[in-house]
């Protein structure tokens, strides 16, 4: 008996997805039990978006005008997919991974697309590691209990009075 399995797809790899893990077919029996509460809630939210997007993508191909909620789900799916891409032999600290995965649920990325993530992901990572206004957010990730707490904290960085509004 195994603890789970990862399903890799060559088609995803050919589209630039690295690692090319098919989330919908990959299973972990203990993964959620070993995650902290924040990561667990955020991963649930991400799986819901990816699942909803998979259902909507077929329908969206036949419609020229999509409802705003459908557009939001499909945009979030594209952002999440781009965020999940990672260069070989690179490490991203857990706090930054959590922040990156929360960003599609903030207003910061509401009008951005996957090209923005592709271009600016390294800049965003660097900012959360070194910018004095953002480092406290990075350090606080391990103390947060919910994804909503993190999203509110990230939203607060957009306020005009804040030293660094991304």
Residue ranges and their predicted role:
Residues 1-166:
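Conserved catalytic/coupling modules of large nucleotide/cofactor-utilizing molecular machines
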């Amino acid at each position: 008996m195994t603890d789970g399995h990862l399903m890799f797809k060559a088609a995803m790899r050919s589209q630039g997805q690295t690692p090319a893990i098919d989330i919908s077919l990959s299973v972990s029996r203990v993964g959620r039990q070993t995650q902290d509460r924040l990561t667990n809630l955020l991963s649930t939210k991400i799986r819901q978006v990816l699942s909803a997007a998979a259902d909507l993508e077929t329908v969206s191909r036949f419609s020229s005008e999509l409802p705003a909620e459908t557009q939001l789900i499909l945009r979030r799916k594209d952002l999440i997919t781009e965020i999940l891409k990672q260069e070989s032999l690179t490490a991203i600290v857990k706090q930054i991974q959590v922040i990156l995965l929360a960003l599609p649920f903030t207003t910061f990325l509401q009008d951005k697309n996957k090209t923005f993530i592709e271009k600016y992901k390294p800049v965003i990572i660097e900012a959360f590691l070194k910018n004095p206004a953002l480092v406290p957010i990075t350090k606080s990730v391990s103390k947060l209990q919910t994804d909503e707490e993190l999203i509110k904290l990230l939203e607060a960085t957009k306020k005009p009075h804040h030293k660094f509004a991304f």
